[in-house]
Amino acid sequence: RAIGSREMLDIREAEYGGEMLYINRSEHHPMWATEYCRDEGLRKYWDEYSYPFHKEGDGPLYKGQPATDYNRNQDELAITMIARWYDYWRERPGTGNRVSSGGTKIIFSDTHYRGAENYRRSGVTDAMRIEKDAFYAHQVMWDGWVDTEKDQTYIIGHWNYPDNTVKPVQVVSTGEEVELFLNGNSLGKGKRQYNFLFTFDNVAFKPGKLEAVSYNKAGKEISRYAVNTAGEPASLKLTAIQNPEGFHADGADMTLIQVEVVDKDGQRCPLDNRTIQFTLKGQAEW
């Protein structure tokens, strides 16, 4: 909070305040970074090039004005998160000690007034704890500490497009350079922004394997990541999401089941958006 915020430095309790102002005190006071980016994106809106072909920022008006920041596609939401994190990362003030280890992207109660939908839209994970691409982007940049301790690379989005599609490919990486390969053929090295983002413009889609290889300053490979074109939908895959202690049949526990449409090789089909019908039998309530 802004009003009287400097007086908060002398209190013993955890309080709400700006991280850039208080990180020098966070060695002794727990802090949660929550509002460094309030942009939102609905999971099913991957990008403008694949189903359902949602135009970036298109959505209902808010008080007669465009609500672009609340109707992002997944690729642009991840890019925005990278840019916002970089603003903090390049400064990273503080004591020099390990005092900042995590952040929280909360769901705002005003979301349903600005975005096309409500809770499914907010956050880098949704209300069901399913990760969005922005989550994996954060994982690359901020895996436990603000300075890189584990080199990682991640390709934003999927690799399933109509024939003749030409689009940019974005890669988030801790390396100094990133080279992109399509079915083993090099497409060159990406343009670097915000330290972690590498963009490859005008990539022509061909089914197969899209792979990003990251290099350090010495030109040595330090990490790689690949995505593959999924085949035709073949089956449903159900995965239980539970705590380390497992489920408790005590009448109070909740069961979360993630449902995926997969091809014959078990690879997720990211663009299959058909309605799924469920039935439930046994001692449980839907």
Question: For the regions a protein language model found, what residue spans apply to each?
Answer:
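Short aromatic-acidic-glycine turn motif
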Residues: K191, S235-L238, F278-W286
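Beta-strand-rich binding/interaction modules
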Residues: K167-S186, K209-S214, N273-T279
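Short beta-strand segments within Ig-like beta-sandwich modules, predominantly Fibronectin type-III
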Residues: L187-Y194
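Edge beta-strands of extracellular beta-sandwich domains
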Residues: A218-G231
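Surface-exposed, short loops/turns at beta-strand junctions within beta-sandwich domains
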Residues: N202-P207
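Beta-strand-rich structural segments
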Residues: V171-V172, S214, A252-C269
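Short, solvent-exposed loop/linker segments at the N-terminal edge
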Residues: W159-T165, P244-T255
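Substrate-binding/catalytic cleft of secreted carbohydrate-active enzymes
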Residues: R1-M141, W145-P162, Q193, T199
